[in-house]
Amino acid sequence: MSKVCEISGKRPIVANSIQRRGKAKREGGVGKKTTGISKRRQYPNLQKVRVRVAGQEITFRVAASHIPKVYELVERAKGLKLEGLSPKEIKKELLKLL
């Protein structure tokens, strides 16, 4: 399963993990020294959000910061004619509203 938000497109990013030793100057030491830098990944906080649209249950995988946007989409979809469509087609129509 992909680690990408379906609404915002947030995806994992690469960041550095820095290991240090020593005492900080502000605490009376000679300063921190870097002893190692390694790559790490930071993942978006993806959550599954299930909503009911046109009698169908649809699941979105979205970042936690965009959960309210899903409910906004559902409100906007009330004027659309979505009856008779499959859940996948309904989801596609909702994402077009963005």
Swiss-Prot record:
This is Large ribosomal subunit protein bL28. One of its GO terms (molecular function) is structural constituent of ribosome. The keyword Ribonucleoprotein applies. Part of the 50S ribosomal subunit. It comes from the Bacteria. One of its GO terms (biological process) is translation. One of its GO terms (cellular component) is ribosome. Pfam families: Ribosomal_L28. Keywords: Ribonucleoprotein, Ribosomal protein. Signal peptide: none annotated. Belongs to the bacterial ribosomal protein bL28 family.
